[in-house]
């Protein structure tokens, strides 16, 4: 079953499968299924066409998913960088934005280690 251009895994419960769509988390998935009148523990393979259509309609009307959600997030980050605020500078330098320490750790954000040459030892005569 495809929703918002994403193939949902058929063997998973509906509430879990919906979280494979970017922009839909666990709480949103539960809310969507409740509005559609579908039990969260039903598998995607068990849903009929009317139920699938109801889910698609709810998502299309009330949620920003996939490309639209990603675009909004990128726009928000670009705005922070353009206005030159602290968070924008941290994004620009690829450093942690939320106040984490960077003397050690922060490897995910900073990338692979770049080795800096150490101090040369003095040669004894």
Curated annotation (Swiss-Prot):
GO terms assigned for molecular function: rRNA binding; structural constituent of ribosome; tRNA binding
Region Disordered, residue ranges: 92-125
GO cellular component: cytosol; small ribosomal subunit
Keyword GTP-binding among UniProt keywords: no
Classification via Gene3D superfamilies: 1.10.8.50, 30s ribosomal protein s13, domain 2
InterPro entries reported for this sequence: Rbsml_uS13_C, Ribosomal_uS13, Ribosomal_uS13-like_H2TH, Ribosomal_uS13_bac-type, Ribosomal_uS13_CS
Keywords noted in UniProt: Ribonucleoprotein, Ribosomal protein, RNA-binding, rRNA-binding, tRNA-binding
Family: Belongs to the universal ribosomal protein uS13 family.
Function: Located at the top of the head of the 30S subunit, it contacts several helices of the 16S rRNA. In the 70S ribosome it contacts the 23S rRNA (bridge B1a) and protein L5 of the 50S subunit (bridge B1b), connecting the 2 subunits; these bridges are implicated in subunit movement. Contacts the tRNAs in the A and P-sites.
Name by which UniProt lists this protein: Small ribosomal subunit protein uS13
Species this protein is from: Pelodictyon phaeoclathratiforme (strain DSM 5477 / BU-1)
């Amino acid at each position: 079953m495809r929703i918002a251009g994403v193939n949902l895994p058929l063997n998973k419960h509906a509430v879990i499968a919906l979280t494979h769509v970017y922009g839909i988390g666990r709480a949103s998935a539960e809310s969507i299924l409740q509005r559609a009148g579908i039990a969260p523990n039903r598998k995607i393979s068990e849903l009929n066409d009317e139920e699938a259509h109801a889910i698609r309609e709810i998502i299309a009307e009330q949620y920003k998913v996939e490309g639209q959600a990603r675009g909004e997030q990128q726009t928000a980050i670009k705005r922070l960088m353009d206005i030159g605020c602290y968070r924008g500078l941290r994004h620009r330098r690829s450093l942690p934005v939320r106040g984490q320490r960077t003397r050690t750790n922060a490897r995910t954000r900073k990338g692979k280690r770049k080795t800096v040459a150490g101090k040369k030892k003095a040669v004894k005569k």
